[in-house]
Amino acid sequence: MEIISPIITPFDKQGKVNVDALKTHAKNLLEKGIDAIFVNGTTGLGPALSKDEKRQNLNALYDVTHKLIFQVGSLNLNDVMELVKFSNEMDILGVSSHSPYYFPRLPEKFLAKYYEEIARISSHSLYIYNYPAATGYDIPPSILKSLPVKGIKDTNQDLAHSLEYKLNLPGVKVYNGSNTLIYYSLLSLDGVVASFTNFIPEVIVKQRDLIKQGKLDDALRLQELINRLADILRKYGSISAIYVLVNEFQGYDVGYPRPPIFPLTDEEALSLKREIEPLKRKIQELVH
C-alpha cells in the first residue's frame, strides 16, 4: 500500500521554479508519511517544463530524499535520453515517462520502442506512466511484457483497467492515479500516485492505516470526503486549486502554477476556501 506524491512545482510570479519552496514542500510530505515522490508529473506540470527545469527539480529534491521517481517524458527523445543519463548518477527509485502524444495513430511498436530506448540506457528501474486521457494512447500490457518494467502509474477512472495490468504483468507494481479511487486502489493494487497528497497527505495516510486495521467503513468515509473535494476542485481547475489548498491545509506558501495552468484570482481563491471549509472541518474531525 504505497502512497506516492506527484509533487507540484512551485513557481514565483516571474514563472521561475522556487527551489526552496519545492524542498520545504517535499520535506513536509515525507514527514506526513508519504512513501516516495513522483517528480515532474502532470501535477508538477512536467509536460510544460523545460529540460533544464526537469533536471533542476530532480537536483533540488535529491537534496531532500532519494525516494524519487523521475518523470522524463518528452516528444524530443534526445532530451529524454539526456535526462535519463543525468539521473544515472543518482541513487533514486526509478525513471518514468508518459507515452509519446499529439501524433495520431502511432503503431504500438513505436510506443514499445520509445520505452525500450529509455530502458536501454537507464541504470534505474522503469516505471510506465499511462495517461490515455492526456496522451491519446492507452499502453497495452502486451507491449510491456518484454520490457524491464518495475511499476506502472495508471491514471484512469476505471479501476478494472488498472487491474488488467496487475493480472497480466506478474511482479510489476501497479498504482492508480485517480484521487477518487484511492480507497479501492489501496485495497486492490500496490498503491496510489495521488495529487491530493500535496494538500491532504495525512488524510490519505490515515486511509491506509484504517484499511490495515480493518476499519474499512471509516476509510470509505474519508474517501467520500475526498470525492466531494474533487468535485469542488474541478470547478476551479484542479491543479491551480491545489496551490491554494496547500497553504489552506498545510499552512505554508508554495507560490503559483505557471501558464497554461493559470493561477486562481484572489476572488476565486477566496471562493474556493469558503466552499471547502465544511469539508475541511469534517476531515480534521475524522483524522485527528
UniProtKB/Swiss-Prot annotation:
Question: What pH dependence of activity is documented?
Answer: Optimum pH is 6.5.
According to its UniProt record, in which pathway does this protein act?
A: Carbohydrate acid metabolism; 2-dehydro-3-deoxy-D-gluconate degradation; D-glyceraldehyde 3-phosphate and pyruvate from 2-dehydro-3-deoxy-D-gluconate: step 2/2
What protein am I looking at?
A: 2-dehydro-3-deoxy-phosphogluconate/2-dehydro-3-deoxy-6-phosphogalactonate aldolase
The function of this protein is: Involved in the degradation of glucose and galactose via the Entner-Doudoroff pathway. Catalyzes the reversible cleavage of 2-keto-3-deoxy-6-phosphogluconate (KDPG) and 2-keto-3-deoxygluconate (KDG) forming pyruvate and glyceraldehyde 3-phosphate or glyceraldehyde, respectively. It is also able to catalyze the reversible cleavage of 2-keto-3-deoxy-6-phosphogalactonate (KDPGal) and 2-keto-3-deoxygalactonate (KDGal).
What is annotated as the active site? Answer: 153 (schiff-base intermediate with substrate)
Temperature notes read: Optimum temperature is around 99 degrees Celsius. Extremely thermostable.
- What positions are marked as the site Proton shuttle? 129
Which InterPro entries has this protein been placed in? Aldolase_TIM, DapA-like, ED_pathway_aldolase
**From which source organism is this entry?**
Sulfolobus acidocaldarius (strain ATCC 33909 / DSM 639 / JCM 8929 / NBRC 15157 / NCIMB 11770)
Keyword list (alphabetical) reads: Carbohydrate metabolism, Lyase, Schiff base
State the superkingdom.
Archaea
Q: What is its EC number?
A: 4.1.2.55
The lineage is: Archaea, Thermoproteota, Thermoprotei, Sulfolobales, Sulfolobaceae
Under Gene Ontology molecular function, one entry of this record is:
2-dehydro-3-deoxy-6-phosphogalactonate aldolase activity
Entry's family note = Belongs to the DapA family. KDPG aldolase subfamily.
Chemical reaction(s) catalysed:
2-dehydro-3-deoxy-6-phospho-D-gluconate = D-glyceraldehyde 3-phosphate + pyruvate; 2-dehydro-3-deoxy-6-phospho-D-galactonate = D-glyceraldehyde 3-phosphate + pyruvate
| Residues that hold substrate according to the record | 42-43, 129-131, 153-155
Q: How does it assemble?
A: Homotetramer; dimer of dimers.
